[in-house]
Amino acid sequence: MSNVRNVFSQLTDPSLKAVIQDEAYRVLKRELAQTRHTNPFAQSPEAADALEALGINSHPYAITSHTHAAAKAIESDLYEVVSHYLPKENPVSFLFMKPAKLRFFHRGPTHGDHFLNAHVEPKDVPRYPQETIINRLADIPTQIAFMGDTLHFLSPSFLTALFAHSPRLQTLYATLVLPPEPSTSRSLYPQIYTLTYSEDGFMYIPGGHAGASYFHKYDQLEWLTVGHLTAPGCPTVTAQRLETKGANHLFIFQRGNYITPERRTFATNDQYVTVPHIFLPENYNCRTPISKTTMMQMFFYIKSGKEAQREGHLGQVQQLISTKELQHYQPSEITLLVNYFEFTATLDSHTCFEDVPPKLAPKTTPAPPLGISRILQFFRGRPSFVKLIKALDWQPITLEFPVRDVRTTVRGPPGFKNPFTQPQPVNPEDADISSRFQDFSRATNSTPKPTVEAVLEASAESPDHHTQLKVLCSALSEGQLEAIHALGHSRCGGPLLPELTAKSTPVEQCPDLPPCPTKSQASPASSNPSGPDAQPTAQNPETLPWVAWLPKLNALGFEALEVQHDPSTGEMIMPITDTQELPRATLPAHWQGHNLERILSTLRSLNRFPTPWSPDRTRARAFTSDVKNSRTGKALHRESQTWKETQTMLTENTQTELAISVIHGAGGSGKSQALQTLLRQDHSLPIEVVLPTNELRLDWLKKLPHNPPEQFRTFERAFVSSHSPVVIFDDYGKLPQGYLEAFALTHANLELVILTGDPRQSTHHESNEEALISKLPPATTIYSAFSRYYINATLRNSKFLANKLGVYSANSCPLNVTYGFQPLPGLHLLVPSLMKKAAFTDAGHKVSSYAGCQGITAPKVQILLDNDTTMCTKEVLYTALSRAVDSIHFVNTNAQSSAFWEKLEATPYLKTFLSLVREDKITEFQAPADAPKPVTPPVTHFPVEEPATTLDDFKEELRDKFDREIFTSDRGHTNCVQTDDPTTQLFSHQQAKDEALLWEMIRARLKISTPEANIEEFRAKKDLGDILWVNYHRAMGLPKEQPDFSEDLWNRCAEEVQNTYLKKTMAQLKGGERRQSPDFHEHQILIFLKSQWVKKMEKLGAKEIKPGQTIASFQQHAVMLYGTMARYMRRFRDALSPNNIMINCEKTPQDLSRWVLNYWDFSKPSYANDFTAFDQSQDGAMLQFEILKAKYFNLPEWVIEGYLDIKLSPKIFLGTLSIMRLTGEGPTFDANTECNIAYTHTRFDIPEGTAQIYAGDDCAIAQVCPEKPSFALLKNRIALQAKPAYTPQERGQWAEFCGYLITPKGLIKDPLKLHASLELAKAQKKAGVRDAITNVVANYSLDAKLAYSLGDDLQDLLSPHQAHLHQVTVRDLVKFGGSPFLNSD
């Protein structure tokens, strides 16, 4: 290795070093990819070192956490080892294994493997899919089987019975998890697992995490030493260990009597020893195994010191034993160990024997008799040296055991107790599911089919007879299977468990290409077109040549049920052409992960599965050479010379094979639609998009506005900056020749290339004739061989235009072709040369060249015909002609010259559009005359009305003050009716100082409960919350995939909440000082009575005063935290909500008016609604709905738990409140609004697209919708009580929303409400309130302006009474100085 290192150190060329590093990185990348597959978790340094000693690599940049990551890595690694033993062609039976783990064995659905599982423990119910459950292992259908981490819990007789009753089974591979060191009282791999002991067994705790631990009995350790298993009359089974890593072992059990090693060792690199028993009694000797290294260090220490001291020995032991290992020792053991060293330190290290070899003994020294020395030792005792040698006779812990034979008894086939044979306790939350299960079971009693229990009992294991392997699923209805599955899931964790899967999942074969459509397959009617002008004809789908492709065409948006013909040739146009079968690419193992598998699934659904591709180094070298010598490109040649030389050397020396998927199709065929949908749904996918032009990049950004901009790069920037394993090259034909190959060879991280383009359109043209790439064939020619089929259909162009180009079209709009002699202003102009492009651009036109217009789509384009047109290729002309949707304007400066007709003859497409005859004169295009300008009607005004009678009807029904006030015996009357003025008495004045009203508000609005009762209610109504959430999810059009949590958006929302709070005045901030204190408990709430004038029309002049509204003052930190939560979800809601649903949040009346004009339907009666006691009615069902909504947006768990805690335990001075909404919470408005939406859509069957508007407890719908039949079963459990209002939507009767009327001209303020409010201000002014008018005139004038600005249109909107109120109000506002606001823009 040193020689190789020396050679590398002598290399000085940076380009050569870059190539070597690139090659090393390619090897490293493959190894890291494999590591990510088997060990994707973040490991501690100690655990990573321990795994590496076992031959398992750890990913250095992994961030995925796991409670027992190291143990999981060993488990996955043993699966990887097993995969090399399993056959690649034949199926294998997997026992006690989840199908999801099949990826660790490098196997998939195509292998047809069998999964045989049983519900033994409760956690097995959600773990194993229902279709894999059996209740006896009687006949394994394959020769080879695998059992994962289960055999150590079973008896040896299970194994012999398994082989005895499965004659086809020859080999069983099994992994066991049994630590071999229980006798040593400590874990050999504390970084991976720990052990605890009891009298009858021990606990195995992977990663020290108690949640993953399980219990072993000591007799289960016998599995580590089993060699042969025999039973009377049964074949012998031979066991042999294949691999051991820590506590995980891989065994093979083979039918037959084979030789197996007589001993097995489980020793590690670290040697452990125990000290001999030198003290009496024996239990006062140290028994703890200690590292031999530590013992040797301690021995040298005690023998190298001058004098033995107990304190010194104890301190040295403390230094040698690390802090982490101290937990494995008892103080008594340490004390005994120190005594041992203290004793051995006193013993003499010098030999006491005088015997020496004869050659070394002096001749004059007589040899003492050996027998005499032994006799003297017997009487005098052993010398100190002999005692020392005996004390140093440490006993090693070898972990080596003899292999033994095991004899078992004869038993029936392995089986498992049926969990349905005895009743099980059901939680209250399971009531609905249990009810469904019982209903399904009862439903089958009236049919010949047996019930669930009967079927399971019939298939239960019997000791003397065995009939079947699996439960007969045909005896169970789909509903029963679903009920069983749901019942099991609900008992083991709820909605996070996997869903019920189908009985069988069809396996899609790749390349999955339907038969190539041929013209000979057409019916006689479709194969004989009537001529060039034949119109498309409807066809029976079964007779279409492309019937096998209809699902794919439908997915792209084509019905494809009619036959279309090329008008120039009369031939049928096929929507799918150029089909070919291609081999499938073999992708790295880590592609079985979730994100990368989604990409493959998308390509598989398109029949575009990747195929192998080896980049052409000749084309790559041509491109990098041109870049190096500045012969091409605008930006790459500005890179450093060293970088350019490195790229050139990489293309010369690198060889690689990648996966490529080529998507070819006509313009507007939806080539990129599925890819854009994939990127839109998941922004985190490791995909980059490379575009040939910045215009195309901006187009992608416009279609995917929420994706990060750096995901889309132009081709030169991508060549320098790209690092993704998957790259999409859109419109790749416009990339320089050789670019794709150079990109693939210089980017070692690239694994999958996706190309989208159209070989029939123009390709990149290199204007520099000196460039090497100018001599290369177009990329579309090369990569057409990698395209499985061509989509010869378009959604863009008119059928009459597309058919002339030989393309199938789904757009039936008529084609409009016009001619002229000069360009029309405002239309996109296409010209054949760059010179003409520059000239017309300078003249003020929007211009593109024929070749440069690729990617542009416009309803109408104009095409310039000149002498350069004849030099354009058919691909360039096709590109230009296919830009228009349904209208083309040809521009020719000399239409009658012979050159013009030569142009038509020289090009293959133009003649199909220009139906001209030489002798006929071309009809010149004449623009239609401008429409006459509308005459502005004369300005009129409403007639002057007498204001004195506007509120007389309300005043006449007024009762006396004390007849209206609320009376209580302990606090007397409330004080809401004030002054003697009848106008003022119409409005209830609620004041915070009114103690009688405060207590009446508490009695009516608040309900005292306990935390336990709140929890019980929350649990009891969870099912209702689930229903509300499902309806809300559907109504708001939320995607199925949950959006990832955005830390950046959360921080911005928190800043907005904080800034809003800091905008308060100093007095307001000081007023909230108490709840800002850290001593103010987060559950504590201060309750106040809201001071207000009640101006609701239904309470105007009310006969009885109603209780006031509450104001709740929460801890300020909690308000800001959950205000941030509400604002965060609001941002997502605003981005995802459908256009027909408007939420009046951060919107102006003008915004609402624009929305009404676009979406509201006034042709039907409308529905509006308010609620009775809306806040108090939001009980446990609404709380569950809020929790599910927060979880959907992936809010941090601590935020959700904190919000739930506050809602369940809110405390006021009277005690704990029940679950309800309180004004003053952070998310009050958003939560009210969303609960309103959820309730409305749960109650009503609202057609899709119906206009709806919501704000808190107010809502309005553009039509009256029928109530869902299911709501009759729910309404008695939902506390909300609606107050619906129906209006016919005609003059004077419009839907009301938040004090506004929704009219065909937009929103206007309710004239009665506005007039009444102004009358109150006038009465207050009269009563002596100096600023009563001044404070409101601006706001009231702006409210009135909504109607005032409509002018005479109000005559069509307002009833006579409303018009009267409007005129009086405007007249008063003008008197009070409101004219500037009424006439403002």
UniProtKB/Swiss-Prot annotation:
Its EC number is 2.7.7.48, 3.6.4.13. This is RNA replication protein. ATP binds at residues 665-672. RNA replication. The central part of this protein possibly functions as an ATP-binding helicase. Belongs to the potexvirus/carlavirus RNA replication protein family. Pfam families: RdRP_2, Viral_helicase1, Vmethyltransf. Residues 518-540 have a biased composition (Polar residues). InterPro entries: (+)RNA_virus_helicase_core_dom, Alphavirus-like_MT_dom, DNA/RNA_pol_sf, P-loop_NTPase, RNA-dep_RNA_pol_alsuvir, RNA-dir_pol_PSvirus. Keywords: ATP-binding, Helicase, Hydrolase, Multifunctional enzyme, Nucleotide-binding, Nucleotidyltransferase, RNA-directed RNA polymerase, Transferase, Viral RNA replication. Residues 635-791 form the (+)RNA virus helicase ATP-binding domain. Signal peptide: none annotated. One of its GO terms (biological process) is mRNA modification. The lineage of its organism: Viruses, Riboviria, Orthornavirae, Kitrinoviricota, Alsuviricetes.
